[in-house]
Every structure is written in structure tokens, then in C-alpha cells.
Amino acid sequence: RQLDEKNWTLFYTKTNERRIVYTWNPLTICEKQNDEIHVIREITTPRLFKQLRGSSHGVHIDDEIWFLCHLVNYEDRRHYYHIFVIISAETYELIKYTQLFTFEREMVEYSLGFAYVKKDGQFLIGYSTNDNTTKYLIIGKDIIDEMTITHQ
């Protein structure tokens, strides 16, 4: 497997072992040992996931790991759309994902990462618009939960 990949996404297991999301379709979970990448798990995901690119690291929320990803649609210019992907912290199986969304309806938006503030039930999301701004959004987890589609 290729060692230099800009769209890899990192997360840690419950036992603090580093893992890599290598691709989103299939959801390919890897580990790095001695400069070699080893596939641990491959999981079937919706066809839409073929277009996903990593944006954020995985964030643990209870028994789930949340990722903020994006895809690029080349309509007349490139348009960025975002999606939260939620997997099981135990099995890495896909649990749910959100509908596609934008932050400001700008063509070029890129997520810089996010954090979850459990006591407030809110996400703090950093993002850029048109490759020349840095902005933050605070949004309730309940709002994101309303946007989710349960994977079957």
C-alpha cells in the first residue's frame, strides 16, 4: 500500500492504538507497522462513499467515532460538500452518516477539523471558504443527529 496519501484519515482505538482510514469505499481500516501499511478490516459502504475524502481525524463520542469528510462535485466549478461519517468504535462498522451539507453555500469550503464539547453537546468546526478565510462554526449535536441516515 502507498505510504504517502493526502486523504488518509487517522483515529485512535479505545486502547489508544493508531489506525488509518485508507479509503471510504470500501471502508478500509489499516495500521502502520515498521513503515508498512497493513489492512485490518474492509467494510462495504454506500456507493457515494467512493467520492469521499478525509478531512478530519476521528473523534470519539461515546461508543462511536465521528469523522467530518468532504467530496468535490465538478458542476461548472468545483463545489465542496461535507458529510459526517459515524462508525462503531468497537467493530468499525458504518453506523450512520449525514446528508451532504455546506457551511455557507460557498463553492469552495474546506473543513479544517472539529472538536466535540460533550458538556455542551456541541461541535466546534473550523473551516475555510474560497481558500482565503478561516472561520468557526458552533453547532449542536442534536442538529447533526437530525441530518443522519442510519446505515442498513
Over which residues does each language-model region extend?
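Beta-propeller domains
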Residues: 1-152
